[in-house]
Amino acid sequence: LGFSVQKARFVSDHLDEAKRQAWITHEWPMILKAAKRKKAWIFFGDEASFPQWGSLSYTWARKGEQPQVKTSGKRKAYKVFGLIEYFSGQLFYQGIEGKFNSESYKTFLTQVLAQTSKHIYLIHDGAKYHTSKATQSFFADHAVRLTECRLPSYSPDYNPIEYLWRKVKKEATHNKYFAQFEHVVVSVEKTLASFAQQAQTVLGLFGFYCREVGLAN
């Protein structure tokens, strides 16, 4: 009958469908065309937190016996900035133990600019440290190399790096116990380093993403 058991997902009640549609039909095609003309890169950026208490997921178990995973209950989390590139599948990332803020974001972007030579179209959401005066000044100062593009509000489903975060959590933290914070860091860094060597896997995320939201790939 075409039905299958699927996990539901939350959808914000603040969605602006007109802006979301405009992104698909107007903004994204313009970015793609401009990037191809300039032979530039298109980076989708986002951040993720990986808490020491781990994360839970489905797993096999005997009927009537719910799996249990030990947890430290500690709320400290390893935070990661990430960018994935649309044409090449390259992954750039930086883990931090501090806070996501304008300064840490600028530091990350500065490192990315130092490691690349092409013009970059950076697509990200409207997080405060993305839109702050300090960050906007950074974009203005680096306009020769960097063009900021903003996703529609409340639209994480329009950012393909979300699929990567899910994969990282599945491999690095799902159903795992971390007695020490350093163990989380090692697990996440190992997983990210692996994906950084799997450009085709990252490119596959873009294909899935484009099919999901109806974008031209």
Please name every model-derived segment:
Residues 1-217:
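Short functional hotspots at interaction and active-site rims
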